[in-house]
Amino acid sequence: MTKIKADPDGPEAQADACCGERTYHELLVNLNPIAQPLASRRLTRKLYKCIKKAVKQKQIRRGVKEVQKFINKGEKGIMVLAGDTLPIEVYCHLPVMCEDRNLPYVYIPSKTDLGAAAGSKRPTCVIMVKPHEEYQEAYDECLEEVQALPPPM
């Protein structure tokens, strides 16, 4: 028995090529009901850039357990949550913790894009970006826009 090699020009390869990147509006279809305040497309891009800079400086907290631990320790930063995480019980307590401690938080549409921005191949449902002087200007710009978003109902 021999293995059959996949045709690189076959229909499956073409389907993968056309569907590799999903647009912002396509990602909005999968949002949770609690994903408020939601970042605009422009703010989402700025947050991804800020996250990439923070990863280089190792000023990032990734994952529910780690982020929750450092919120309880009193660390400050911008909380970025993925709006397409299911089940929502995994991280629905984090916005309440942020509001109690006056930490800014925002939802973005995709956990896979959030994980990729953090330099991981795995999807990530929550990231905390801490301030650092190397990317302070980008951080302050994101912080200002996140704080200007309307509060959730």
UniProtKB/Swiss-Prot annotation:
Main location: nucleus
Function: Required for ribosome biogenesis and telomere maintenance. Part of the H/ACA small nucleolar ribonucleoprotein (H/ACA snoRNP) complex, which catalyzes pseudouridylation of rRNA. This involves the isomerization of uridine such that the ribose is subsequently attached to C5, instead of the normal N1. Each rRNA can contain up to 100 pseudouridine ('psi') residues, which may serve to stabilize the conformation of rRNAs. May also be required for correct processing or intranuclear trafficking of TERC, the RNA component of the telomerase reverse transcriptase (TERT) holoenzyme.
Keyword entries, A-Z: Isopeptide bond, Nucleus, Ribonucleoprotein, Ribosome biogenesis, RNA-binding, rRNA processing, Ubl conjugation
One GO term describing the cellular component: box H/ACA snoRNP complex
Subcellular location: Nucleus, Nucleolus; Nucleus, Cajal body
PANTHER family given in the database record: RIBOSOMAL PROTEIN L7AE FAMILY MEMBER
Protein's gene: NHP2
Cross-link named Glycyl lysine isopeptide (Lys-Gly) (interchain with G-Cter in SUMO), sites: 5
Protein name: H/ACA ribonucleoprotein complex subunit 2
Subunit structure: Part of the H/ACA small nucleolar ribonucleoprotein (H/ACA snoRNP) complex, which contains NHP2/NOLA2, GAR1/NOLA1, NOP10/NOLA3, and DKC1/NOLA4, which is presumed to be the catalytic subunit. The complex contains a stable core formed by binding of one or two NOP10-DKC1 heterodimers to NHP2; GAR1 subsequently binds to this core via DKC1. The complex binds a box H/ACA small nucleolar RNA (snoRNA), which may target the specific site of modification within the RNA substrate. During assembly, the complex contains NAF1 instead of GAR1/NOLA1.
Protein family according to the UniProt entry: Belongs to the eukaryotic ribosomal protein eL8 family.
